[in-house]
């Protein structure tokens, strides 16, 4: 199973929408830049029919070095989470098991 890259997304926009390659690449970059800016500003990103990007604060917690067994603290941090929307879930589930 491969991965869809930003370059491939730009190529698809070029092929399907008739944008030139530079415009397609800029469009993809701007899309992700808007998501980054919103998250940096503590905003939730809601993409209708796709899902939501949220920020979550995690508290410090105890951890363990797997090699030595030594206890080490895992520092508090903010993480980005993604929750797929119902439409995306339904489409993915509809194709489950149809491709190797």
Curated annotation (Swiss-Prot):
InterPro entries: Hist_DNA-bd, Histone-like_DNA-bd_CS, IHF-like_DNA-bd_dom_sf, IHF_alpha. Transmembrane segments: none annotated. The keyword Transcription applies. Pfam families: Bac_DNA_binding. The keyword NADP does not apply. One of its GO terms (molecular function) is structural constituent of chromatin. One of its GO terms (biological process) is positive regulation of metabolic process. This protein is one of the two subunits of integration host factor, a specific DNA-binding protein that functions in genetic recombination as well as in transcriptional and translational control. This is Integration host factor subunit alpha.
């Amino acid at each position: 199973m491969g991965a869809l890259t930003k370059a491939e997304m730009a190529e698809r926009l070029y092929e399907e929408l008739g944008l030139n390659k530079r415009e397609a690449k800029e469009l993809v970059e701007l899309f992700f830049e808007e998501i980054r800016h919103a998250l940096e500003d503590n905003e939730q990103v809601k993409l209708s029919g796709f899902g939501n990007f949220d920020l979550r604060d995690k508290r410090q917690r105890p951890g363990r070095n797997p090699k030595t067994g030594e206890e080490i603290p895992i520092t508090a941090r903010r993480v980005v989470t993604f929750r797929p929307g119902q439409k995306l879930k339904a489409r993915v589930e509809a194709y489950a098991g149809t491709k190797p």
